[in-house]
Amino acid sequence: MGKMKILKKLLSKKGQLSMEVGVLVAAAVLVAIIAAYFYVKNAKSAVASAGNKSAAFINVTANKSQEYISNLSNI
């Protein structure tokens, strides 16, 4: 019975959504937009960070491989 009261409150007599539901939907959309903005912002910085880390890894492996090659030449 409580569900029917909520349903009646959400819907007006003409079957249109009430102002409360409109505000609730607008708030949900706003939260989704804000969350998407921060997700994209963090994804962008994560890509840059991954690029820097991969470049550093390539440099380390290049240095180590050069070191091993020079050690082999000394044998």
From Swiss-Prot:
Location, primary (coarse class): secreted
Entry PTM: The N-terminus is cleaved by the prepilin peptidase EppA, which recognizes the class III signal sequence.
Sequence motif QXSXEXXXL, location on chain: 16-24
Keywords: Fimbrium, Secreted
Propeptide cleavage-removed residue intervals: 1-15
UniProt keyword Plastid present: no
One Pfam short name: Class_IIIsignal
Location in or out of the cell: Secreted; Cell surface; Fimbrium
Protein name: Probable pilin MJ0431
Native source organism of the sequence: Methanocaldococcus jannaschii (strain ATCC 43067 / DSM 2661 / JAL-1 / JCM 10045 / NBRC 100440)
